[in-house]
From Swiss-Prot:
Record keyword Magnesium present: yes
Domain of life: Bacteria
Gene that encodes it: acpS
Positions contributing to Mg(2+) binding: 9, 58
GO molecular function, one term: holo-[acyl-carrier-protein] synthase activity
Main localisation: cytoplasm
Protein name: Holo-[acyl-carrier-protein] synthase
Taxonomic lineage of the native organism: Bacteria, Bacillati, Actinomycetota, Actinomycetes, Mycobacteriales
Names of required cofactors: Mg(2+)
Subcellular compartments: Cytoplasm
GO cellular component, one term: cytoplasm
Amino acid sequence: MGIVGVGIDLVSIPEFAEQVDQPGTVFSETFTPGERRDASDKSSSAARHLAARWAAKEAVIKAWSGSRFAQRPVLREDIHRDIEVVTDMWGRPRVRLSGDIAKHLADVTIHVSLTHEKDTAAAVAILETP
């Protein structure tokens, strides 16, 4: 297996919280019903959990874009909804893809790590091929 892309993203939770539920923002169509449900089930702020998921989506896009260095982008700009962050019964995150990005990354394993510290959420994504 080989690493073909690495992406990282940081999100200011207070700034994200101001925008996440505003009509007309990019976030209104970004999260799947499952992601919104998981965030609302948590004991702390839903915005805190969604911010980490936004960071993960951005990290995956950056990892994929970096793997295509000097090549024309092939994904549309509203790809975020096709990147879903799910968790297993122990709360470990995993990325589930659909649509065009799933076709482009069909043979790629995506490793993702999310974190929150004070007012910041962050995520790292690593793309690996067999």
